[in-house]
Amino acid sequence: LGNRWSAIAIPRRTDNEIKNYWNTHLKKRLMQMGIDPVTHKSTAAEELVHYSIIPGLRPVVSTNLTHMSQWDSARAEAEARLSRQSSLTSPASDLAQTSLEHQKSNLSTKNDVNNQVASSNFMSSWKAQVTETLRPNFGVVELDKPPASPVNLQKFLQEWESSLKAPQPEMEGPSIHDSITNIPSLSSGTASELVSTQYSPDVSSASYRMPVSSMILPSPAQISERLMASRHCDSLLPLPRIDLAGSNIFPAQSPSATESSFSFSGLCKVDNEHQYSPTSILHGPSGHDSSYSSPCGSSSSAYDSVDILAQTFSLVHNDNHQHSRATLAMNFSQEPSFWTQQQVALVDALQPESYFTHELGVNIAQKPPSHSFNLSVNSMVNQVGVPNNIPFHSLIICVESIFVAYFRRSRCTSIANLHMFFVFRFYFYLFYFSFDFYRVPLRRRKSQW
């Protein structure tokens, strides 16, 4: 036993110093915490009296002991509750095992309680004062009190089932047959009825009915005509018209497409300024002046109408199909747009002067400007003047041939000779390009003289 201190000795600490530190510091600290320094268990009151702990430290020791006893009792109660619950669902073999564990836990709990009773008696008055000051009085909570009016679950379920089986008020609406057979064409009404569908609420039945007769949809013939007019293509054939009078889909009482109330003046031949204006797609109400009309067309209906398709695209009929195509072709041959005019003006501003082609005897800059896009591009390509540099190019070829012949004959192997050779070539080309740059103003002065 004497060598146990040397087993934990540090290089600069002897076993005697470690033993003294244990006896003077660590042992007293464990005793103040209520732990036996030998067995590392909670100490009893007799041991505390035997070790004569300071009276000022006794409240700390007692609180530690009471907390430990509370945790032990709570643990024992939890184990007992778990064993009781498991005994209801486990087989007989598990019952025997849990009963043994329960007995062992009860014995250990009784031993702990007996050991801690003596240590907690001398501080009972102090503990009572602490509990009264720190723990508020919440009153008595009655958790096991039965409710005053118990709920009859069976009666509640029966009432719920009967409410589900009761007939529900049906929501009346348009049927499939009505949606197919009672759809009138666009010629029988105006577009305002299509935009603002009327609803008639029935207060007695608490349901809303939407009359299908108020829904206005365009006829197939008008849809095909509008698609044909919107494509602006001569290669497309006109779509076949559908005779609504002989069709089985629409009823006999629905008006045909020939009774259209829309009349378009001049097949919607509008100018570019008013084609997309707000007034081109809106009709004035009936209360306005009768002289007001849309630039694109008018309606003879008594209701207000907003027909975007009819005002944006013209209706192309079979009898005047050729006339409408001629009208569309005439619309394309208009004045050039703003950007085309700007491009022509830019090309005219960038035209070369007469001295570029003075040797050829042609003065392209005096050509009248073209106002078409294709002609402006062609004129821009044709007006590119090429300076007459044939003598200078021949001079460059001759000088380069002389340089190459001199380089091969002299066999310039030294760095100095190569340096002088390239420096001479650099200054020669610098002089050539500077002369080529300044020769244009010189030729301009000669032409002015």
UniProtKB/Swiss-Prot annotation:
Keywords: Activator, DNA-binding, Nucleus, Repeat, Transcription, Transcription regulation. Residues 1-30 form the HTH myb-type domain. One of its GO terms (molecular function) is DNA binding. Residues 5-26 bind DNA. Its main location: nucleus. It is found in: Nucleus. GO terms for cellular component: nucleus. Possible transcription activator. This is Myb-related protein Pp1. It comes from Physcomitrium patens (Spreading-leaved earth moss). The gene is PP1.
